[in-house]
């Protein structure tokens, strides 16, 4: 695949491996496929209108990059498509898949400087579709913004912890980097769109990175160190305004409702002839009219009823006379009291 892969002896083993990520991918060299490819393979992908100007500017660099791997690239601005093809000199059978991923990333607004990294052996890409994970558009926009974070801080922290380049564009999230990091990015993105805040996964990745440094904890379970997320937003069914109380269960069927004939039999109306029924109806109608006329008269005469008057209280003059103090009697009383004191 990539010529800049470090050439060194690979430790091939047939025994079980504890950590598959630690294994080195063996380099594929031209000597491994001296006869080249039998048939021509090609892949094409469409790109949006707003990417036309950028792709037109960087296309000479794309052709130069793919020519190093003996691939041919075509840009059709009329149709709005990019095509990559193998040539007779192409010796790597998987490089056409890598170049297909590169043009897909460029169509999803990934810059060429980042997209060309996918041609390396230890680098892959993942385009995560998030448009159909949330039904309501308002929730989708809110959760997608939560993935980016304030001033792109959350996205930057994800990139630092996973060693991947992540780009949120429209209804997709494009990730580019090592395969282990791509798995972590996919988990974070899917959890975020399922209403799990990315800070929980970021904390878990930070804790795992610290635990990896301790060789004593290499063979132990790390679940006790990781934060546990509890969903507090329990969706409750909307309760009706007026609840109907449940009737007591009975094994018997409900009683059959009374029919019109049953009601007439109960009142005795069933046995009356036509004239008697009409007379009864007329009598009921007259009674209703008389009751309604009586209520209407009461409502009309209500305005002519005199209001109740309060009984007059005692006048101010009479109240003042009642409260008047007899000064002469008070003087005589005081003089009498002083004489008693002098005698004693």
From Swiss-Prot:
The record's section on Pfam families has: KH_KRR1_1st, KH_KRR1_2nd
Look up the coiled coil feature and give its residue ranges: 271-344
A cellular-component GO term for this protein: nucleoplasm
Q: What is its main location?
A: nucleus
Q: Which domain of life is it from?
A: Eukaryota
Q: Provide the alphabetized UniProt keywords.
A: Coiled coil, Developmental protein, Nucleus, Ribonucleoprotein, Ribosome biogenesis, RNA-binding, rRNA processing
Please explain the role this protein plays, according to its UniProt record. Required for 40S ribosome biogenesis. Involved in nucleolar processing of pre-18S ribosomal RNA and ribosome assembly. Binds to RNA. Required for female germline development, cell viability during eye development and for survival of dividing cells and epithelial cells during early wing disk development.
The family classification in the record reads: Belongs to the KRR1 family.
**What's the protein here called?**
KRR1 small subunit processome component homolog
Organism from which the protein derives: Drosophila mojavensis (Fruit fly)
